[in-house]
């Protein structure tokens, strides 16, 4: 499932708003820091599990 540039921007904005490091964000999404880098770049064809984790991160308060 495709993580779009829009999703990527939302992840970066939320990470900044919560004042999380990339490492902390990767742990919250349950991915490696390298995968988080791909997510934050956008246009990443993620497995369904990773896509779901990213979407859950974006909707949680």
For each feature predicted by the language model, list its residue ranges.
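The alpha-helix within a helix-turn-helix
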Residues: 15, 26, 55
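DNA major-groove recognition helix of helix-turn-helix/homeodomain DNA-binding modules
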Residues: 30, 47-61
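Residues that mark the N-terminal boundary/hinge immediately upstream of a DNA-recognition element
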Residues: 10, 21, 47-50
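Short alpha-helical DNA-recognition segment
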Residues: 19-37
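Intrinsically disordered, low-complexity regions
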Residues: 2, 36, 52-56
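A short, Lys/Arg-rich alpha-helix, primarily the initiator
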Residues: 1-17
């Amino acid at each position: 499932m495709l993580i779009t540039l829009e999703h990527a921007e939302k992840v970066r904005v939320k990470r900044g708003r919560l004042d999380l490091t990339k490492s902390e964000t990767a742990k919250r999404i349950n991915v490696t820091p390298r995968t988080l880098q791909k997510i934050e770049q956008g246009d990443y064809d993620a497995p369904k599990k990773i896509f779901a984790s990213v979407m859950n991160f974006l909707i949680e308060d």
